[in-house]
From Swiss-Prot:
Main localization category: nucleus
Sequence ranges of Basic and acidic residues compositional bias: 260-273, 359-379
Protein name: Testis-specific H1 histone
Comp. bias (Polar residues): 345-357, 395-418
UniProt biased composition (Basic residues): 127-149, 157-171, 187-211, 245-259
Organismal lineage: Eukaryota, Metazoa, Chordata, Craniata, Vertebrata
Species of origin: Rattus norvegicus
Keyword Transferase attached: no
GO molecular function ontology, one term from the record: nucleosomal DNA binding
Region (Disordered): 114-273, 344-418
GO biological process: chromosome condensation; negative regulation of DNA recombination; sperm DNA condensation; spermatid nucleus elongation
Coiled-coil zones: 292-330
Phosphoserine carried by residues: 38
GO cellular component, one term: chromatin
Length: 418
């Protein structure tokens, strides 16, 4: 059995795991002469295909085997037709993958054999359809049959010997592979054991060295502590008085310096607090003054806006009144002019009491069209002088105006603002 695997594939599956097997039928029956050679050839082709392609697919494998003269087809169930004819000549190939999974048949494409030429007599006899009478004597002699039997026996012995040799070779190969694997495993186990022993020895040596160093350090520390204690006891008795006096003096000086520093810090803090309070009071007063000034300015601006709005309204009302007065004056002047014209006509009619002359009659009898075409007589209009208005800007005299009326019209003049 030969195995070959490719890690990745594209078209037929993500992975292809190929395994070559011989069918069970071939093992049960008589062995074929070229069975081992065909399996070896197929395994060699598989190895070449795997080495030649980075990602081996089922299509590429079929192409490689087809170029070498082999045909690959999926195995059909045993009950279908055509299985008995090809069961002895194919090599079983098992492919496992995501999409291409199953058993495939691989067999050598056999070339068509040339038929032996027939004699003319046989052709003629077959063509005419005549049956040839067989002689009661057999065609082959017995000596030839014995030789054939012996040859078959020899061939069977050789086949058995070849089969035994192949089995021995396979067993030797398996034993060699197993021995190699066992030797590799034993070598790996030995190397691991050696590395573990070395690491344990190193760790033990390190632990021993560290323990020795610790023990020496402890012993030296104990001895130094004992000697230091003894020397300190001796020196402490001597220097205790001196150190006590010096420490008392230093403590007194330190307390005095600390008290002075604290007093200075407190005084500085008080002065800073006072200055900050003064600055804050000044800032508050300034802000209050600014707020008051802004409020006063805002109130003044509002008052000015209110006064200006009132003045504008007053001016608008006065202008409207003046316009109305002017219109009334114009209307009165027009009425006076009409009244005067009517009075003048009445006077002329009263004065002309004499009978009508022929010219007047003719003029009166003129057609209406000529009368319409005659130009109208101009009417005298009186020119009126505009009223002069004076307005005092003082707040106490708001609403009071000085008016002057024209002497010709006699009507009161209009009031306005300058």
């Amino acid at each position: 059995m030969a195995e070959a695997a490719q890690p990745t594939g594209e078209s037929q599956g993500a992975e292809l795991t190929i395994q070559i097997q011989q069918p069970v039928e071939r093992a049960l029956r008589t062995p074929v002469r070229r069975g081992a050679q065909s399996v070896l050839r197929v395994s060699q082709l598989l190895l070449r295909a795997i080495a030649g392609h980075q990602r081996l697919t089922l299509a590429a494998l079929k192409k490689e085997l087809g170029n070498a003269g082999y045909e690959v087809r999926r195995k059909i169930s045993s009950h279908q037709a055509g299985d008995s004819t090809r069961s002895e000549k194919y090599t079983l190939l098992r492919v496992s993958g995501s999409d291409a999974a199953g058993y495939f048949r691989v067999w050598k494409i056999s070339k068509p054999r040339r038929k032996a030429p027939r004699s003319r007599l046989t052709l003629g006899s077959h063509s005419h359809g005549k049956t040839v009478l067989k002689s009661p004597r057999p065609l082959r002699p017995r000596s030839r049959r014995k030789a054939a039997k012996k040859a078959r026996e020899v061939w069977r012995r050789k086949a058995r010997a070849l089969k035994a040799r192949s089995r021995r070779a396979r067993s030797l190969a398996r034993s060699m592979v197993r021995s190699r694997a066992s030797s590799r495993a034993s070598s790996r186990a030995r190397s691991r054991a050696r590395s573990r022993a070395r690491s344990r020895a190193r760790s033990r040596a390190r632990s021993r060295a560290s323990s020795r160093a610790r023990s020496s350090a402890r012993s030296s520390a104990r001895s130094s502590a004992r000697s230091s204690v003894r020397s300190s006891v001796r020196s402490s008795a001597r220097s205790s008085a001196r150190s006590s006096i010096r420490s008392r003096a230093r403590s007194r000086a330190r307390t005095r310096a600390r008290s002075r520093a604290k007093d200075l810090v407190r005084s500085k803090a008080r002065e800073q607090a006072r200055t900050r309070a003064r600055e804050q009071a000044h800032a508050r007063a300034r802000t209050h003054d600014c707020v008051r000034a802004k409020a006063q300015e805002y109130v003044r601006a509002k008052e000015q806006q209110y006064v200006s709005a009132k003045e504008q309204e007053y001016v608008r009302t006065k202008e409207q009144e003046c316009a109305k007065a002017r219109e009334q004056m114009r209307i009165g002047a027009m009425e006076e002019a009409r009244i005067k014209a009517i009075d003048n006509r009445v006077q002329t009619t009263m004065e002309d009491t004499s009978p009508w002359s022929t010219d007047e009659m003719r003029s009166r009898t003129k057609p209406r069209e000529e009368k319409r075409q005659e130009p109208e007589r101009p009417v005298k209009q009186t020119n009126q002088k505009p009223a002069v208005v004076k307005v005092d800007n003082a707040p106490s005299r708001q609403g009071k105006t000085c008016t002057k009326s024209s002497t010709k019209s006699g009507h009161p003049g209009c009031s306005g603002t300058s």
